[in-house]
């Protein structure tokens, strides 16, 4: 393959206009690891260069090759994403510590992913993290070639995404008065807790992830795990409240009232704004851990069951079929918006 490549201050990460941003990222990675400041260029070079390209012929669009000799480092992807993953592998080969030069051993790497969907999940509803921390999380995902970020944005313990049509979701639903200590010990820390992301925050984070070839899949959990939303809009619950943003862990009986037409409008409105913020093909609607206790004694829910002819059988109760009714409603709305539901 040849001898090692010496990266020093006159070595340029080089990419065409499409890959210029990746060249800049690589220069930043090298600076972070070693303190060595490199300039980037879009001009072709024959030596003393880390050349990025995306012309590799391969059946897998995320494939890449790395070749290192004494004059050049070549990173070639089957697409811009493939080149990006090659950059991440090169990044992991960098030494750490202040250096005037970096030696990259002569080598050849041919790599491609086994799985096209490589995902990670972050729950910011129960434990909020700042927008900067989310970006740091995305950086870590990029380092490990993760290309899907499942973002759990709402739950009983907090609503974290700004919905302009329902401002109380963040004014009230984003903050709980206190948090239980341990696993429902009955003791509380007495400290208010919360936070949320503005729609501008969301757009910036979505763009930041896309630059790293990561698709964010947002999750709005329904019809259970909605007590934070009910604290803001109690009329959406079976009892009308009052509710509070939940201070415990586990599963609460406070769920959306499916017999209330306002609930269906609420779901449509929220999903409209979510779809406008996230270009992902998939939108996650949760659907898990929804107790049917309130529905069994809610006149509106029982009326909906009767009106929709949702009958129990040997496998499902009428209330379980009521949940399916709501999920189908959400799915049909997302399909009309050109998206696919998961959950």
Question: Each PLM stretch: what is its role?
Answer:
Residues 264, 268, 272, 276-343:
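Gly/Pro-rich turn-and-neighbor structural signature
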Residues 3, 8-117:
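Contiguous, structured surface segment used for ligand recognition
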Residues 125, 154-158, 221-225, 288-292:
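Active-site beta-loop-alpha junctions enriched in small/polar residues
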């Amino acid at each position: 393959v040849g001898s090692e490549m010496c990266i020093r201050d006159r070595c340029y990460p080089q990419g065409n206009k499409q890959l210029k941003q990746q060249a800049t990222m690589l220069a930043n990675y090298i600076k972070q690891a070693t303190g060595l400041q490199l300039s980037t260029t879009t001009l072709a070079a024959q030596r003393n260069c880390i050349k990025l390209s995306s012309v590799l012929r391969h059946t897998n669009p995320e494939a890449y090759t790395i070749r290192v000799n004494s004059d050049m480092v070549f990173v070639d992807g089957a697409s811009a994403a493939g080149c990006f993953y090659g950059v991440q592998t090169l990044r992991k080969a960098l030494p750490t510590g202040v250096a005037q030069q970096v030696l990259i051993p002569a080598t050849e790497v041919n790599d491609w992913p086994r799985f096209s969907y490589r995902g990670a999940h972050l729950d910011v509803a129960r434990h909020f993290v700042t927008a900067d921390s989310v970006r740091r999380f995305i950086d870590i995902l990029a380092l490990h070639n993760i290309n899907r970020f499942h973002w759990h944005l709402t739950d009983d313990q907090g609503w974290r995404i700004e919905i302009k049509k329902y401002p109380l979701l963040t004014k009230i639903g984003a903050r709980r008065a206190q948090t239980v200590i341990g696993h429902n010990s009955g003791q509380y820390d007495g400290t208010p807790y919360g936070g949320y992301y503005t729609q501008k925050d969301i757009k910036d984070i979505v763009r930041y992830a896309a630059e790293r070839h990561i698709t964010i899949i947002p999750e709005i959990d329904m019809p259970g795990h909605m007590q934070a939303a009910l604290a803001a809009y109690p009329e959406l619950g079976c009892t009308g409240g009052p509710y509070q943003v939940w201070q415990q862990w586990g599963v609460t009986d406070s769920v959306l009232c499916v017999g209330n037409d306002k609930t269906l409008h609420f779901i449509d409105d929220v999903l409209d704004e979510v779809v406008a913020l996230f270009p992902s093909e998939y939108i996650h609607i949760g659907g898990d851990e929804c107790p049917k206790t309130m529905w069994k004694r809610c006149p509106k829910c029982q009326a909906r069951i009767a009106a929709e002819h949702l009958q129990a059988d040997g496998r499902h109760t009428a209330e379980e079929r009521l949940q399916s009714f709501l999920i189908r409603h959400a799915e049909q709305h997302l399909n009309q918006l050109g998206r696919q539901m998961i959950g």
